[in-house]
Curated annotation (Swiss-Prot):
Protein name: Somatostatin-1
Subcellular location(s) per record: Secreted
Source organism of this protein record: Amia calva
Record's GO cellular component terms: extracellular space
Protein family per UniProt: Belongs to the somatostatin family.
PANTHER family: SOMATOSTATIN (PTHR10558:SF2)
Gene Ontology molecular functions: hormone activity
Function of the molecule: Somatostatin inhibits the release of somatotropin.
Biological process annotations from GO: regulation of cell migration
UniProt entry tagged with the keyword Disulfide bond: yes
Disulfide-bonded cysteines: C15-C26
Major location category of this protein: secreted
Keywords tagged on the record: Cleavage on pair of basic residues, Disulfide bond, Hormone, Secreted
Length: 26
């Protein structure tokens, strides 16, 4: 969870952070 601002939101969506902003662990 590199981005605490949108980490919990993207994790809920399903690892969208990969191409959302940066790499985040689901």
């Amino acid at each position: 969870s590199a981005n605490p601002a949108l980490a919990p939101r993207e994790r809920k969506a399903g690892c969208k952070n990969f191409f959302w902003k940066t790499f985040t662990s689901c």
